[in-house]
Structure formats: C-alpha cells, structure tokens
Amino acid sequence: MFDFEYQLKNLPDKPGVYIMKNSLGEVIYVGKAKILKNRVRQYFRNSKNHSEKVKAMVKNISEFEYIVTDSEIEALILECNLIKKYKPRYNILLKDDKHYPFIKVTMNEDFPRIIVTRNMVKDGSKYFGPYPDVSAVHETVDLMRRIFPIRTCKKYIKENGENIRPCLNYHIKRCNAPCAGLISKEEYGEIIKKAVGLISGKNNDIIRELKEEMEKASMNLDFEKAADLRDKMLAAQKVTEKQKIIIGNFENEDYISLYSDEKDSCVQVFFLREGKIVGREHFIVENTAGENEGDIIGEFIKEFYSGTAYVPKSIYASAGEDLNLLENWLTMKRGSKVEIKIPQKGEKKDIIEMVKRNSKITLEKFKIKLLSDKRLNENILIEMTEVIGLEEVPHRIEAYDISNIQGVDSVGSMIVFEEGKPKNSDYRRFKIKTVKGANDYDSMREILTRRFKHGLEEVNSIVNKNLSLSAGKFCVFPDLILMDGGKGQVNIALEVLKEFNIDIPVCGMVKDDRHNTRGIIYNNNEIDIKSNRKIINFVTRVQDEVHRFAITYHRSLRDKRVLHSVLDDIPYIGEKRRKALLKHFGSIENIKKATYEELMKTPSIDKKAAESIVSYFRGRKGE
C-alpha cells in the first residue's frame, strides 16, 4: 500500500519531475517542478483552488514517483520526453502532432536526391522550410525533377561503385543514371548546385539559360527539344514564383493565442515566414475550465515545440508561464537564441488579437459542428436500434476482427465507437498467444476471453479501492458488440459472454461477394440494411475501421519479424542502429556489401558495431 503521508513528508527540496499513477500502475500525469516538495504537495491540499481537470486527476492518483534533476531546465527536458513516452491522459496531448515538411537535398550522398521530409536531422543534408502548405512543397519538388535530371531512387549509389542497369527515368531523360556510371560525381554536383540555387531563390540564371537554349533549338529547327526546354523554363518560373512567397529578408515568427469558453479552449498558432502569414494551426484543448491562460499556453508551447522540427527565432504569445525556462529550452533545441515575448502594443499586439479572434471563431465552429454531428449520430443509433430490434440504444459499441496470413503473426483488434464516433484511446490490440495456425474462431475466442476477463478483474479492483471507471483499460463494457463476420463469429462471442455471465447483444457484420457490407446478423437472422443509407454507411465505417486497425498491427509485427531475422541477430545492433543503417544504406543487401569504413560513416554506428556487422555477414557467406 502506497503511504501518501510518508512520501509527501519526504519529498526533496530540489528540482525534478513527478509521475502520477493510477491503481493499475499506468502513468496518468507527468509534471516538472522547481521544488518537488512544494509542487507535489499542492495537489493534495487546497482542492478548492484546483481546476475541474486537476480534481478529477487527483481522485485517480494511487501513487506517485519522482526523479530529481540538477536544474529546472533538465526537469523540463525530461518532462517532455516522459510525456512523449507515456502519453498521460491528463497532460495536454496535441492530436495533430505533425511536423511541417521540408525540402531536403541529401548532400551527404555522393549523388544527392531532392525529397520531401518532415524530420530535420543533422546528417549533412541541406534543408529548406518548413512549409505549412504541404501540396505546394510536393509540387515544387515535382517541378525540380522536371527541370533537373536528378535521381529519385533510394539506391545506395557510390562513386566508382558497382554499376547496374539504369531504370526508366534514364530513358525518358529524367535522370542521368549515376547508378550505371553514366555521369561523374563532379558533373552531377554541378546540377545539384543549380537546383539548390533555384530552391533558395538565389540563382535565377537557370531561367535565362533555359530560354537561350530554347531559342537556339528553335532556330536549329529542333522543335521537340525546344518544347522540352520551354516546359522546363515554365517549371523554373513557377518554382521561382513559389519561392517569392517564402524567401525574403524578414524574420520567421510564430504567434500564439487562445480563446476559452466555460469548458474548453482553442489554441491557435499563426506562422509568419519571411514577413508573410503562410499558415496557421489550431488545437482544441478540452476540459480547461478553471485554468488560467498563461498555464494553458505554457503547457501548449512545451507540447507543440517538442514535436515540431522547426523552432523560429521569435515567438509571440498572449500569455505564458515559465517563459525564461521555456526560452532556454527552445534555445537549446534550435541551437541559437530564441525569445518568447508578450506584446503589449503595436503591430505584434494587433496580430496576437487577430489570432485570438480566430481562436474564438474556430472554437465556436467546432462546437456547432460537434452539436450537429452529435444529433446526426444520435439519429443513426436510434434508427439502428429500431431496425435491428435492440432493447436499448448502443451508446458504446465495440467491434472485433482477426488478421493473419496463413496463421502467421495472427492478431486481434478491438475498436470502440462512443455516441457514434471512434474513441481511439480505447482501441486495443491483441497478439494471439494460444492458437496455432489460421483459426479465426479460436483466435476470436481467445481475444474476447482476455478482454472480458481483464474487464471483470478491473471492475473488482475499482470497486474495492473506490476508484472511478476511468482508472481501467477494460472495465467499461459495451452496449453492443459487432463482429466482423457471420453467424460463426457471433456464436463464439455469445459463448464467451455466457462463460462470464455477461449479457451484451452481439451482431455480425456480413459482406456480399464484392466485399461490400450487406447486412447485420442478430438473433440468428440476417437483417437487410441496404435500404437504409445512413445505417449501412455507419456499419461500413465500423467494419472498415476494425479491419484497418487489425491489418496495421499485423503488418507491423510482420515487418518486425522480417527485419529481426537479419539485423536484430547482430550483436551491438539495437532498434536505433537498425533504423540508422536502413536509412543510410537503403536495404539489407547494401548493408551486407558495405565496408567497415562505409559503416563507420553511419550515424550512431561505432567501431564495435561496425566490426560486429562485418564479422556477422562474413560468417554468413561461409554458411
């Protein structure tokens, strides 16, 4: 039993990170503190001043632990890492944690490529961006490939390496085939130099050169070549026009503000790149009643910039807490000075007010759509209840599916729809443990047995400890179970429920010969739902989602198994080094051929690891 009084009394008077856990040992909140003793004790005292979210969290805390750090900045870095690792339910977790795309020129390769990436790493490549307009970035890269004969393949091509047969791109004059040794590293480098100049907006000579070549070809009556050069010139002009939007002599700045109603908040970020607003993002933060604006924005900054690949020089916010600490952390992340300012007047203040107004509009639209969707989903569930003949409206629906290929890497999936919407946080995956071969019925029996056994155990634990249902992973039972299959799968589910003395209606989702949803099996009867477009769309959506979730997990296990058979058997090669090797060399075949010196150039590969790889593959050659 966790002794709260003793643990609170003995908290250290130092900076660090505290980790709150529920009765199941799951991490539900991670926070950092300048003085651990003061911060952690606050949660268990003066509850009148707590926000509704904090009150709900404290009710679910069964124990806590802490990690002492040397400084507050270390605590902040550790906090961000632990939030990424555990994704605690009471921390602000941005649902749209995407990186904005960069244009990447792989200068660390003998024959560089121009690609789109969302991750910026120190690997010797040149990066341009980030750009919020994803489609514009892809269009720019496509245009660059039309203008310059640059390779697009992922092959590991080395100067003076083994020559291979060139692909179709060479024959249609989209690549100069460095893979076949048809262009030198120096000649290829000159092409890349021109391409980089065009992307950066610093070299528009290429347009003039293309125009001169086009006119020359036209005079020589080589109209096919002239037309090709004309298309390249127009593409180059289009690239230059795009760069005018994103290249200039202005600073890059982000502006952050929020609007809160009585329950939730909308945080909005406007991105200024080279003096122009080039994009914006909004994030709905739920259950913020009672929290002040500075705390929400401070938490948002930590979450947002720990995920994004790009940190601007200046960030302007409408409020904020621990700004000096956040500035120091972002400065470390960026590698140069970052300032967070709260403008009080002038143009910057006007932009912040504009961001705030947009946050209000976005939150209001979100609530209106939420209400509209809620009414629509309610109507669908009511109609489905009547058509199928259920006794009650199914507010919570669980759907199950099995995925395998000839019994290998067999997995099961459980997805959840609440009030007609997916509840991703309650999705669960099961690796089949007791069934050998392709036996979907026994596999389904196993995952349902595990699901409801865990659920009943959690319910008993929660009742005994007087906790809320949110403390468990399986303790909330559905109002309806949907099986991806016919009568056989339905009967398996009913048998499992009977064993546990649980009464939940079970339906089967059946498809026609074209693999389209056809009807619902309930009480051994097939109910035709084709005439009701809303119901069939909903059931199809559930069926597609449970299948997607199952097959995604199956593929991840299959890929892991395939990779494990080779790289994971090599001493000193863990997951991080495995990924680095595949990223650097492109394939296992290229890793096998790599020399010790080439391996040493791979990020994270040290002398011992390189020797281990060489030794492993030499040994396999003799097998």
UniProtKB/Swiss-Prot annotation:
One cellular-component annotation, GO: cytoplasm
GO MF annotation terms: DNA binding; excinuclease ABC activity
Domain UVR: 204-239
Superkingdom of source: Bacteria
Compartmental location: Cytoplasm
Cited PROSITE patterns: GIY_YIG (PS50164), UVR (PS50151), UVRC (PS50165)
One biological process term in Gene Ontology: SOS response
Main location (coarse class): cytoplasm
Domain GIY-YIG: from-to ranges: 13-92
Signal peptide annotation: none
Keywords on record: Cytoplasm, DNA damage, DNA excision, DNA repair, Excision nuclease, SOS response
Protein family per UniProt: Belongs to the UvrC family.
Protein task: The UvrABC repair system catalyzes the recognition and processing of DNA lesions. UvrC both incises the 5' and 3' sides of the lesion. The N-terminal half is responsible for the 3' incision and the C-terminal half is responsible for the 5' incision.
Subunit description: Interacts with UvrB in an incision complex.
Record's protein name: UvrABC system protein C
Organism, as annotated: Clostridium acetobutylicum (strain ATCC 824 / DSM 792 / JCM 1419 / IAM 19013 / LMG 5710 / NBRC 13948 / NRRL B-527 / VKM B-1787 / 2291 / W)
Lineage summary: Bacteria, Bacillati, Bacillota, Clostridia, Eubacteriales
